[in-house]
Amino acid sequence: MKPSLLDFRLKELQANIKPSFRAKQIYGWLYHNYAQSFDDMKNIPQQLKDELAKSYVVNLLKIVKKELSNDGTIKYLFELQDGKTIETVWLKMKDEQIDEEGCVTQEAKYTICVSTQVGCKVGCAFCLTAKGGFTRDLTAGEIVAQVVALKKDNDHKHNRMINIVYMGMGEPLDNLDNLSRAIEIFKEEDGLCISGKRQTVSTSGLSNKIDRLGEMDLGVHIAISLHAVDDELRTELIPMNKAHNISSIIEAVKRFPIDTRKRVMFEYLVIKNKNDDLGSAKKLVKLLSGIKAKVNLIYFNPYPDTPYERPQKSDMIAFQEYLINHGLLCTIRDSKGIDISAACGQLKEKTQSELQ
């Protein structure tokens, strides 16, 4: 496959495209106008476009299917150049605010949930993506292309703020080289200009890779998919815990460079009769003592044939209240897109079933 122009930072394109100002124009077409082909680049000489087309492609993704939730969540299934498919989610976090005179006082806020791999190696017991196994890493361009495609499809101007969470298909830190390149591309001032502070890397806990990410000093946030407070249950839910146990993860988090004004996010997927009891809440308080942490409780999002169940709302609230009363900042994540195939891997699985 040819590489995409989305695989490169501006300085790299400038080194390969002469005169260099043309590279900057092309960068504008990619990230300000969301060009899908060389033909879209109206002020670029045809000879240069023909030359570039011999070595590069522009668009890497084809929308196979998308589903719109009542809450504004949009789930996308994309086909890659090699025919593999990935999922990306457009999340509406806050509605637009309008005053009595009809003036916008606050723009709507959006987050894009991005995939980093086709499939996943981690094999979490509760995750539908894990059923399909691992196929390959995404390139940096394929990671970047998801954000470009969603901003284009939702008419979201390049200079409007957006947050990125690497919480889609795959383990981000298992594809760290391509992930870090994508992060740097997003940060480009002449591109989308999405700072590290607006990018969150979610990991199931590759403790050695947490250290390496910290050494890269990319300025991103991390979120730890903890989901259990003892190694026995966590190994059941996340088999990789045998190699990267809870203790090693906590120590890696303590070493990670964190903005003193920020907190480390710990994600805790709550599953009925597994980890929703107050005994688990008590252990969680002890586990996170000494860490400037925020706990995000997440309702398990059921899918067909899963043995796990969604917890009761009353149990979620009791769990949250216990953590708050014992000094932890704790939120319950709104269940986005519950009326559509919003759990990771669901839309892909559903579409494949329909085609059979």
Curated annotation (Swiss-Prot):
Disulfide bonds join 113-344. This is Dual-specificity RNA methyltransferase RlmN. Its main location: cytoplasm. It is found in: Cytoplasm. GO terms for cellular component: cytoplasm. Specifically methylates position 2 of adenine 2503 in 23S rRNA and position 2 of adenine 37 in tRNAs. m2A2503 modification seems to play a crucial role in the proofreading step occurring at the peptidyl transferase center and thus would serve to optimize ribosomal fidelity. Belongs to the radical SAM superfamily. RlmN family. It holds the Pfam family Radical_SAM. Gene3D superfamilies: 1.10.150.530, Aldolase class I. Keywords: 4Fe-4S, Cytoplasm, Disulfide bond, Iron, Iron-sulfur, Metal-binding, Methyltransferase, rRNA processing, S-adenosyl-L-methionine, Transferase, tRNA processing. [4Fe-4S] cluster binds at residues 120, 124, 127. It comes from Sulfurimonas denitrificans (strain ATCC 33889 / DSM 1251). InterPro entries: Aldolase_TIM, Elp3/MiaA/NifB-like_rSAM, Methyltransferase_A, RlmN_N, RNA_MTrfase_RlmN, rRNA_lsu_MTrfase_RlmN/Cfr, rSAM.
